[in-house]
Structures are given as C-alpha cells and as structure tokens.
Amino acid sequence: LNVDGRGELLGEFKPNDRLLVINQTGKLKTIIPELTTHFDEDMIVLEKWNPKKPISTIYYDGEKERYFVKRFLVENENKEELFITEHEKSQLEIVSTDWRPVAEIVFTKVKGVQKENQTIDLEQFIAVKGIKAIGNQLTTDKLKQVNLLDSLPFEEPVEKVPEEIEVIGEESISEDIKTELDDDGQITLSLE
C-alpha cells in the first residue's frame, strides 16, 4: 500500500472502510488499510471491501472429488476464514467479487468424446449462503479447466440519504403545542 500513486488504485477510504484480501489457499480476511501492511505471496484479490457484495467461487473438494460452486458474504470481518473445505487436496479454482460473475467449464475428453464447454451464470446457479456452506455441486463430469469470463452487467443500487426534510402545511402536535411554517419554510413551535 502507498499514497504515492504507484500501482493499482484501490479507492478512497474512510476510517471504517476495510480491504478484502483473498489468498489462493481459499482463505479470506478484511483488514483496515495501513501503509505498513504486507501481503502474502499467494494473494489473488485485494480490493476495497463492500459488505453487501457476495463473493463467488468454484473450488475442488478433495474429499468428495467434485467441483462445487458457492456464493457468500463475509460474516466475520475481524477473523481470517477458510471458505473451501479443509481437505489437503481441496483447491480454489476461481474466485470473483463481481456482482454477476460468469464461468466457463471445459470438460475432459472421455473415450475420445469431447463434451461441449458450458457457460455458468453463478448468480443463477446458486443463491448467497453462509461462508461455511459447501455449496452446490457444479458437475459430476471430470473437468479439464475452469475459466472466469466477463461478468454480466450490474448497477449497484445507490442509497439515497435525504439531506433535508421538508414539512408542508400546519399540523397540531398536541393541544399545547402549535406548529407553523415561517417565511423561509422552517417549522416554528409555540406553546399555548
């Protein structure tokens, strides 16, 4: 991290903003950005964290010997968590922090027959679940490769925060208190 304008811009940060860090080992954490922070060599995602934005992944479960898809939100921002199974042969294939990611799966040729590649809209394939969920099985077929394609378009909803509340008209709150609008449209209270 630096403030010299070198490297990739991660955005502007407020005091409570955090960075999302995901490693190739299937571990993630969020951290408060500091200039002295150093990152592991196997880091594959480093971006400003949006707590409402799901993380999508396809991983190989070493115990079940199958590929799984899962989508989840970071549940504990103060703790590093493993989001793939703990088996020694489990491995992360792809991870995306896009809202609507799309993946292509390339099948292994079986007995000289090549099955056609398949495109998967991960948002449609599985709902957002907990980080500890195994996920949905991707396929029973053997895979040669998993590729992350361009994500589908998505516009993040913008929260509108009202700056001023305008009260129109005159209303009596109680018999003892009377409200009126003055010349500037401001409410005046008077006790009777």
Q: Which residues make up each language-model segment?
A:
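C-terminal interaction appendages of subunits in large macromolecular complexes
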Residues: L1-E192
